[in-house]
């Protein structure tokens, strides 16, 4: 098995994937900003890929290209390795972009008490909550500056701030009791 990083522009994505599979590659990992294209490009999508509208893994089986999103399962596996239980917990999900969309289905399967999506753009967070409307009773949308009336058990950062070397400014009372 060999593993190598290749830079591919979005306009060249489909041609590059086809070329790699023709060269004998059996699978590919895909990262930002190409995950949505990967999901749309595939002939067959896993349930996770369909739900979140993105894929980070492509593979060829016969003449068909398959897509999967393993981000959510990876996060859940990490929680399990750390003995972190999500059932009946209050979870804050920072951000409502592609990463949040990719992990939300897996989070919901673990039956948290509530998932509160905090985002700068409330409209974008509402759209994400609407996408998973069957579970909306457990999903709340809040402004990133809104004072919470509960203490979260788990906070997940799915924003791009860390990759952009930016800070996320959150109200102190999310993490600390007021004196």
Identify the residue ranges that each predicted region occupies.
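Rossmann-like adenosine-cofactor binding region
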Residues: 135-179
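NAD(P)-binding Rossmann-fold cofactor-contacting core
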Residues: 110-133
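Conserved acidic residues
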Residues: 26, 113, 153
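Residues at the starts of beta-strands that form the adenosine-phosphate
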Residues: 2, 90, 113-114, 138
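Glycine-rich adenosine-cofactor-binding loop
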Residues: 69-72, 79, 84, 88-112, ...
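Glycine/Thr-rich phosphate-binding loops of Rossmann-like dinucleotide-binding domains
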Residues: 38, 103, 164-166
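Receiver (REC) domain switch-region micro-motif
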Residues: 28, 91, 155-156
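Phosphate/diphosphate ligand-binding glycine-rich loop within oxidoreductases
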Residues: 1-82
